[in-house]
Amino acid sequence: MTTLTITRPDDWHVHLRDGEVLKDTVRDISRYNGRALIMPNTVPPVTNTEMALAYRDRILAEQHGEQFEPLMALYLTDNTTPDEIRKAKATGKIVAAKLYPAGATTNSDSGVTDAKNIYHVFEAMEEVGMLLLVHGEVTHNHVDIFDREKEFLDTVLAPIVNDFPNLKIVLEHITTSDAANFVNNASDNVAATITAHHLLFNRNHMLVGGIKPHFYCLPILKRNTHQQALIEAATSGSKKFFLGTDSAPHAKGAKESACGCAGSYTAHAALELYAEVFENEGKLENLEAFASLNGPDFYGIARNTDTVTLEKASWDVPETMPFGSDIVVPIRANEKIEWEVK
């Protein structure tokens, strides 16, 4: 196959940051996506409706594709109220709220200290039909970083799923076979996003032969057996899994340091990277469902009506890309990618 035309895709989990870098991050994300769900862990975090709408306006001011629509999410804290959820839902522009366990990832210090603290907020979300997005890791110091997703599933997410059966939940950027199995065995109200980098890489890529800081992300890359389980889930055709890049840019110097930031930048070539994975598995026919259909169907949003075309054409990823007044190192920098969106 040398060309593949699919319904225009969406990205259901992306970080654009804020300020001067928006001109670059929005350029990449709006190049061929119809919509993108924008993560709210900016500085300061997007904790209320007014902040979300203002952030949306700043994004729209930089968009490059007329077809592009940013979808917004609220950042849940111990102080989030049911009234704020209702207010956000009423805008029609804020489609979800994000649960970050405090300290779990970049700019998550204001996150929720205990999910039970906001059960009344989950009740309101269930009532109005707002989706719950979950960063699925515990933050206890005694739990090994490679085990934090599994521990979260057992101790935090399972009770939420049980206590709120009508709440739609997306387990974001899953990284383990445990998470894939959890989603497969849960009700149809539970789904998951999977990143391109967790499909393409495992912890050996990050650690063998020297530390590769641009592969460092949270949740952290796991062993090969987990990577294979993610590939199987993503390419299976199951409606429970869909595209969410978790593209998370940091300036080159913030990554290549003694205490580097977590996050990998893939928005420059996300669909092309996913296409490589699906082609390698002989499952290109399932890429459209994963990238373009399952996400809007789960969110209850109309599918995009136009298309994009991928061509089998090798191209070189640049060593760096503009990031405001700085630069970012994209995934596969100085390497070739075998598909290209035309």
Curated annotation (Swiss-Prot):
What pairs make up the disulfide bonds? Answer: none
Q: Which organism is it from?
A: Vibrio campbellii (strain ATCC BAA-1116)
Checking HAMAP family in the record gives: PyrC_classII
Query: Active-site positions, per UniProt?
Result: D246
Q: Which family does it belong to?
A: Belongs to the metallo-dependent hydrolases superfamily. DHOase family. Class II DHOase subfamily.
Q: Where does Zn(2+) 2 bind?
A: K98, H135, H173
Question: Any idea of its EC number?
Answer: 3.5.2.3
**Pathway membership:** Pyrimidine metabolism; UMP biosynthesis via de novo pathway; (S)-dihydroorotate from bicarbonate: step 3/3
- Gene this protein is translated from: pyrC
Q: Which residues form a coiled coil?
A: none
Protein residues bound to substrate: H15, L16, R17, N41, H135, L218, H250, A262
PANTHER family given in the database record: DIHYDROOROTASE
Kindly give the PROSITE patterns that the UniProt entry links to this protein: DIHYDROOROTASE_1, DIHYDROOROTASE_2
Instruction: Extract the InterPro entries matched here.
Output: Amidohydro-rel, DHOdimr, Dihydroorotase_CS, Metal_Hydrolase
Alphabetized Pfam families for the sequence: Amidohydro_1
What is the official name of this protein in its record? Answer: Dihydroorotase
Q: How is the cofactor bound?
A: Binds 2 Zn(2+) ions per subunit.
Which controlled-vocabulary keywords does the entry list?
Hydrolase, Metal-binding, Pyrimidine biosynthesis, Zinc
